């Protein structure tokens, strides 16, 4: 059990309910699971566009699978490292992080993210992980002003990039476009960090750390050419969640692509099997030499067996590293893959990226979503007190009275939309043949 300070919530008063004996992290998991933001993930793009097929994964099913893998990793680590059992004492904590990790991602995946980042280019930018933190700590209406009011340790674990936007932003000459249709995502990649408005919450999360730990934890690598700075460190819990996320992305999204015929066994042989069959690790060399036959078999049970074999291989190959430069145990220890498995996971992720995500048909869907998001933002920003929903108008007006960042309210609203809702709203606003706006209710 870690220090009680990590169980604290910003709004200290707990809702006392009859015979409620749940742990703090079980409460966190319940708040995430029952939130509107989590439910909306069922209609948000994972890799393949919503509506292309009824088999593929959405961000909701992806998050559930990340949660399952995350608890599997945690169970393995508890067996391997009994001396660290006190740091791995709660499966509910890891589940909470895995369920919540994508909750801030906008409609249309990275196309929507780039679109919002461009529209917010003069107002602090936009990035999905930063929006996740914002939803958990401010926007989701479990409380009036504190979002879900989660424990400090859960919020520490969700921080993949524990520094603020202005600390990581690197000014670069980026041409503003004459038309939204000319926007290139490669020129408008977002800063990966916390929005300026949420910096006080970040400070609260990091309060228990020593000055030395905090300075090291929020430090960032110098950005390469045309790149923003990136933070160096994550907490133990975050490192487990990120490994679970990467495993699900590389393996389960691969399964979607196989079932839908987007990738072939010849592609697999060329890009994956030929590279990994010569691995120094005996298990990797053996499995990747032959597992393609099962992955691409016509019998579904053979493919599922192969997917299970791959997931198990990665989950059981995770170690814990110690960084003696940190005092706080939650920062001192991090999970990582054994080097041959880290290389194999990289090969799988690159395969999905090259053969699936960069496929022109997928990029066209992303491009279309990019246009929808930018045009919606432009419309709302042109006359927010006329076009925004009433409750969002109230937030916009409050922000205006405080001389705050009004465009952040618009970004909050659009980023919470599902793919389908954003597309229908765009049609209602810009298509002469669209029906009544009442249909959107």
Curated annotation (Swiss-Prot):
Protein name (record): Deoxyguanosinetriphosphate triphosphohydrolase-like protein
Which positions fall inside the HD domain?
59-250
Keyword check for Hydrolase, yes or no: yes
Keywords assigned by UniProt?
A: Hydrolase
Q: Which family does it belong to?
A: Belongs to the dGTPase family. Type 2 subfamily.
Among InterPro entries, the record links this protein to: dGTPase, dGTPase-like, dNTPase_2, HD/PDEase_dom, HD_domain, PHydrolase_assoc_dom
Q: Name one GO molecular function term.
A: dGTPase activity
Top-level taxonomic group: Bacteria
User: For this UniProt entry, which segments traverse the membrane?
Assistant: none
PANTHER family recorded: DEOXYGUANOSINETRIPHOSPHATE TRIPHOSPHOHYDROLASE-LIKE PROTEIN 2 (PTHR11373:SF40), DEOXYNUCLEOSIDE TRIPHOSPHATE TRIPHOSPHOHYDROLASE (PTHR11373)
Task: Give an example GO biological process.
Answer: dGTP catabolic process
